[in-house]
């Protein structure tokens, strides 16, 4: 299907893609799988954990420090544009809804 994109960490299911809005479900079938550290130049995101749990790590660009937080089921987390972020599943079959202000490809991987 055109609305499902497979990744090393799992898959994303796009349920809405408008000019200024995008809605996705991110599915991590295996614990310990993670997205690479990355940022978006203009995209802002909000996440809601539907199932399982995640560890989110982000860099506060104001102080240059990395922070981590566990996100259990029911958690909400917002990511401003230009914020380096990494997401790792802590349980098998973890999933979250993602809403963002854009559906354009605005993904910049950090590191190797």
Which functions belong to the PLM regions below?
Residues 60-82:
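Short acidic-glycine-tyrosine-enriched beta hairpin
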Residues 27-28, 48, 70, 78:
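Residue-level "contact hotspot" at macromolecular interaction interfaces
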Residues 35-38, 56-58, 77-79, 84-90, ...:
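Short beta-strand His + acidic residue motifs that chelate non-heme Fe in jelly-roll/DSBH
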Residues 46, 68-70, 84, 93:
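Well-ordered beta-strand positions in beta-sheet-rich domains
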Residues 5, 86-112:
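Double-stranded beta-helix
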Residues 41-61:
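Glycine- and acidic-residue-biased ligand/ion/polar-headgroup-sensing regions
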Residues 25-47:
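Short, well-structured hydrophobic secondary-structure segments
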Residues 1-25, 34-36, 69, 112:
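A short, N-terminal "cap"/entry segment at the start of jelly-roll beta-barrel domains
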């Amino acid at each position: 299907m055109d609305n499902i994109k497979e990744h090393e960490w799992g898959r994303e299911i796009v349920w809405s893609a408008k000019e200024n809005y995008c809605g996705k479900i991110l599915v991590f079938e295996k614990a310990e799988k993670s997205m690479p550290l990355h940022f978006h130049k203009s995209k802002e995101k909000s996440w809601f954990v539907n199932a399982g749990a995640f560890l989110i790590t982000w860099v506060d660009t104001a102080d240059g420090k990395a922070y981590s937080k566990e996100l259990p089921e029911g958690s909400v987390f917002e990511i401003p544009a230009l914020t380096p972020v990494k997401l790792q599943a802590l349980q098998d079959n973890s999933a979250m809804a993602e809403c963002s202000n854009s559906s354009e490809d605005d993904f910049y991987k950090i590191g190797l």
